[in-house]
C-alpha cells in the first residue's frame, strides 16, 4: 500500500480545528488531528510528520498547566505553522514574549498589511495592498523569538504574520481556515507546497487502500453491516462488498418511521442492483407499538435506540458466525471521542446510534470511513459509482419521522407526514433547489386548526416546512425561499394531502434552535 506523507495538526482546543483539516484535505494532503496531551516524543517519532500545524485554542500561555507542544517538535526539521494560540505558544517556547491582552484583544474582522520583506508562504497575498483576516485573541505576542521576522501587521497585532524562513517556522495571529479570511486557503496551499507534499491523497487512492485494509483485517470471516440507506452506511456497505463480496451481509431495520417509499428504494438498490446479501427486517409493528402514547422526545429517541439494538442483534444472529460489525464512523466522531478537553458537555439530544452493539455482541469493528469527513464520504461514494440520488441525499435522523412528529405518534399522523414531506421535496427538486439546501423536511405539528375547503369546515393538522443551509450541521440558517415558492408549496400540500389545512415556514436559525424539531 502507498504510504502517504502525513501532516500533524496538534489541537490546543480551538472550535475550528476541524476546518484546518478540511482545508488541507481539499488540497489532497493527508492530515490527522491529535490533542496536544497525546502528542509525546514517542508519538512524534512514530507518526513522522512531514509538517506540523499548531491550532488555536482558548488558553493563555500564562495559565497553570497551559497546553504546550512537546519540545522535540521543534527539532524534527520539518515546517511548522502556528495559528493564533499556536503562534503564542511557538514564541513562548522559542524565546519570544507574550503579554496578556489588556486593550489589545481582537475579535472579528481585521486587516493585515505587509512589511517590506516578502515570504513564500504569502504568495498570492497583498496583491491589493492589504488582506482581510479573522482575529480571535486576547493575549498577544510582544516580542518575537530569535530568528523570526515580521511579515504582516494589523492595528492591534504588530506581529500578525511572523516567520523564520531558515527553519521554515511560520506563525500567524489570525485564523486562515475560516471563510472570513478569504485568502486563507491560499496560505495553506503555499505551506504544504513549501513542505513538499505531492497532493496524492485522492479518493481513488483511498478506495484502493481501504479495500486492501479491509481484506487484511477481515480475512475469510463474515461481516454484518447495519444499513440505513443514508450516505455513510451506504458507502461503507458498497466499499466493504467490493473488498470481500458475499462475506458481507447487510441488515436493514425498517422501524416504520421512514419516508415515503424509502424502504423499497433501499432494498431495490442494495439487493437487486448491488446483489448484496440483505436482511430486510420489517419491525414497524414492534417500534410503533412501543412508541404508542409516548410524547417526550428523549423517551422517543431512547426507546427507538434500545429497540434498534435488540432487533439488530436478533437478525444479525440469523447470519451465523459473523466476527465483524461494520459501522460508518466518520473522522469527526473519532476526533470527538479523543477530544481536547475530555470534559463533560451538556447533552442537547441523545444520539441514536449502534454504539453499544460491538460489546454486546462480542464483535470486532470494521470502520472503513473513520479517516474521512462527510464531503469526502460523498466523493468516495461517487468514486464507487453510487447514484447521485443516494450520495446527495439530505441528512435523515436515525429516529426518523418520530422526531418530526412532535407529541404522540400514530400511524395516521405518520402517513400524513410522509405525504406532505414527499410533496415538499418534490417542489424543491422541481425548482432546482435541492442541492442548495443542507436539509429540508416537514414537521407535523400537534395542533389542529379550523379551515374552509369548498363549502365545508375543516379541522385538520398544521405543518411546518423546514429548510436550512449549513456547512457541517453545527450552525444553520433558514433557506430564503421566495413567497411564490412557499405559496405554491402550501397550496399543493393542502390540496394533495388529506389531513392538513394550514402550512407554516420555520425561519429559526441554529442556534438558538436546532435543525430538527425534537
Swiss-Prot record:
NCBIfam families: guaA_Cterm, guaA_Nterm, PRK00074.1. Residues 6-200 form the Glutamine amidotransferase type-1 domain. This is GMP synthase [glutamine-hydrolyzing]. The gene is guaA. Its EC number is 6.3.5.2. Keywords: ATP-binding, Glutamine amidotransferase, GMP biosynthesis, Ligase, Nucleotide-binding, Purine biosynthesis. ATP binds at residues 228-234. It comes from Cereibacter sphaeroides (strain ATCC 17029 / ATH 2.4.9) (Rhodobacter sphaeroides). Homodimer. It catalyses: XMP + L-glutamine + ATP + H2O = GMP + L-glutamate + AMP + diphosphate + 2 H(+). CDD domains: GATase1_GMP_Synthase, GMP_synthase_C.
Amino acid at each position: 500500500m502507498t504510504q502517504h506523507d502525513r501532516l500533524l495538526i496538534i489541537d490546543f482546543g480551538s472550535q475550528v480545528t476541524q476546518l484546518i483539516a478540511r482545508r488541507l484535505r481539499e488540497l489532497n494532503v493527508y492530515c490527522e488531528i491529535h490533542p496536544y496531551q497525546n502528542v509525546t516524543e514517542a508519538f512524534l517519532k512514530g507518526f513522522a510528520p512531514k509538517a506540523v500545524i499548531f491550532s488555536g485554542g482558548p488558553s493563555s500561555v500564562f495559565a497553570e498547566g497551559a497546553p504546550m507542544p512537546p519540545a522535540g517538535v521543534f527539532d524534527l526539521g520539518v515546517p511548522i505553522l502556528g495559528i493564533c494560540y499556536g503562534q503564542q505558544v511557538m514564541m513562548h517556547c522559542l524565546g519570544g514574549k507574550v503579554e496578556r491582552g489588556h486593550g489589545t484583544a481582537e475579535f472579528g474582522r481585521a486587516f493585515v498589511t505587509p512589511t517590506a520583506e516578502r515570504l513564500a508562504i504569502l504568495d498570492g497575498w497583498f496583491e491589493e495592498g492589504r488582506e482581510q483576516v479573522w482575529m480571535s485573541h486576547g493575549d498577544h505576542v510582544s516580542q518575537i523569538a530569535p530568528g523570526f521576522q515580521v511579515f504582516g501587521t494589523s492595528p492591534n497585532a504588530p506581529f500578525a504574520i511572523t516567520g523564520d524562513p531558515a527553519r521554515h517556522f511560520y506563525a500567524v495571529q489570525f485564523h486562515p481556515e475560516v471563510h472570513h479570511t478569504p485568502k486563507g486557503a491560499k496560505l495553506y496551499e503555499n505551506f504544504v507546497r513549501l513542505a513538499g507534499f505531492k497532493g496524492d491523497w485522492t479518493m481513488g487512492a483511498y478506495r484502493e487502500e481501504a479495500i486492501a485494509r479491509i481484506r487484511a483485517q477481515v480475512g475469510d470471516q463474515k461481516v454484518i453491516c447495519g444499513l440505513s440507506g443514508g450516505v455513510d452506511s451506504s458507502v461503507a456497505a458498497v466499499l466493504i462488498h467490493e473488498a470481500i463480496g458475499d462475506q458481507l451481509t447487510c441488515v436493514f431495520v425498517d422501524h416504520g418511521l421512514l419516508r415515503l417509499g424509502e424502504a423499497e428504494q433501499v432494498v431495490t438498490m442494495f439487493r437487486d442492483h448491488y446483489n448484496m446479501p440483505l436482511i430486510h427486517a420489517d419491525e414497524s409493528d414492534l417500534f410503533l407499538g412501543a412508541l404508542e402514547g409516548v410524547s417526550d422526545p428523549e423517551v422517543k429517541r431512547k426507546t427507538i435506540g434500545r429497540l434498534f439494538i435488540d432487533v439488530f442483534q436478533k437478525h444479525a444472529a440469523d447470519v451465523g458466525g459473523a466476527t465483524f460489525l461494520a459501522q460508518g464512523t466518520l473522522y469527526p466522531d473519532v476526533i470527538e471521542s479523543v477530544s481536547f478537553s475530555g470534559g463533560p458537555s451538556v447533552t442537547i439530544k441523545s444520539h441514536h446510534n449502534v454504539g453499544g452493539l460491538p460489546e454486546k455482541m462480542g464483535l470486532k469493528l470494521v470502520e472503513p470511513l473513520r479517516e474521512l469527513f462527510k464531503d469526502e464520504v460523498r466523493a468516495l461514494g461517487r468514486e464507487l459509482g453510487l447514484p447521485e440520488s443516494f450520495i446527495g441525499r439530505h441528512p435523515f435522523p436515525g429516529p426518523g419521522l418520530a422526531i418530526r412528529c412532535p407529541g404522540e405518534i400514530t400511524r395516521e399522523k405518520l402517513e400524513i407526514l410522509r405525504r406532505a414531506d414527499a410533496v415538499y421535496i418534490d417542489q424543491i427538486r422541481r425548482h432546482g433547489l435541492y442541492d442548495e439546501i443542507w436539509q429540508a423536511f416537514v414537521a407535523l405539528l400537534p395542533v389542529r386548526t379550523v379551515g374552509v375547503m369548498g363549502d365545508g369546515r375543516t379541522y385538520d393538522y398544521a405543518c411546518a416546512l423546514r429548510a436550512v443551509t449549513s456547512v457541517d450541521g453545527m450552525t444553520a440558517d433558514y433557506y430564503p425561499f421566495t413567497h411564490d415558492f412557499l405559496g405554491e408549496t402550501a397550496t399543493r400540500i393542502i390540496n394533495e394531502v388529506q389531513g392538513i389545512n394550514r402550512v407554516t415556514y420555520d425561519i429559526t436559525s441554529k442556534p438558538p434552535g436546532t435543525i430538527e424539531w425534537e
